[in-house]
Design a protein with these regions (language model features):
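Short gly/ser/thr-rich secondary-structure transition/capping motifs
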Residues: 15-23, 87, 141
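Short, flexible active-site-adjacent loop segments at beta-strand->alpha-helix junctions, enriched
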Residues: 26, 40-41, 48, 63, ...
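Catalytic core of membrane glycerolipid acyltransferases/transacylases, capturing the structured
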Residues: 6, 15, 28-87
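Short amphipathic alpha-helix with an adjacent loop that forms part of the alpha/beta core around
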Residues: 26-29, 97-98
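Structural motif corresponding to alpha-helix initiation and N-cap regions
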Residues: 22-25, 68, 90-93
């Protein structure tokens, strides 16, 4: 209930402040868990990509973001969970897969950091490994900003068609080459959505 209230208030605020629009909402699965893989340009991205997702998403966020109690409460309301840097890839992957297997959707930014100039980076293979181990579809998402984040600058959030586990054609213990190919497929889809 708190999540729904915050989400609806955020939609209204973003529409007034930025003129936000959404495309491809019909591509979000109605049932089952899934991963949303999105480009990363702004601290607002986790909120933006989840505004049209009916079921709450979870997010990985660096532990430092949870030090401020007010900000911590806000990002936890949107499903963020802390990840300790240096925890090791396997530990982070296990947590993410556990969230998906417990029935929660996962939003992830494969680039691993924000893009300063808006170009979509190469991404990392973690998103591919999580998808492979959890056996869930990946919904590519592109957030396109018109210029910088200033009042009334347009933001468009685009959701692409889900990439199903069958389309991924990957084992649950994939080789590095398989992971790289899958990551490239996901990143190409994201780039296409951003540049459309």
């Amino acid at each position: 209930m708190v999540y729904a209230f915050i989400r609806n208030a955020a939609i209204l605020a973003y529409k007034i402040w930025y003129g936000i629009s959404f495309e491809g909402v019909e591509n979000l699965p109605e049932e089952g868990t899934f991963i949303i893989a999105c480009n990363h340009r702004s601290y607002a991205d986790p909120v933006l990509l989840s505004l049209k997702v009916k079921r709450r998403c979870t997010y990985m966020a660096k532990e430092e973001l949870f030090k401020n109690p007010v900000f911590s409460a806000l990002i936890r309301a949107f499903g963020a969970f802390p990840v300790q840097r240096g925890q090791g890839d396997n530990g982070i992957i296990d947590i993410a897969v556990g969230k998906l297997k417990s029935g929660k959707n996962l939003a992830i930014f494969p680039e691993g950091t924000r893009s300063k100039d808006g170009t979509v980076g190469r991404g990392k293979t973690g998103v591919a490994l999580i998808a492979a181990r959890a056996g869930v579809p990946v919904v590519p998402c592109g957030i396109a900003y018109e210029g910088k984040l200033h009042f009334r600058n347009k933001i468009t959030v685009r959701y692409g068609k889900p990439i199903s586990p069958e389309q991924l054609k990957i084992s649950d213990n994939p080789a590095p080459r398989e992971l790289k190919e899958l990551k490239n497929t996901i990143m190409s889809s994201i780039t296409e959505l951003v540049e459309r």
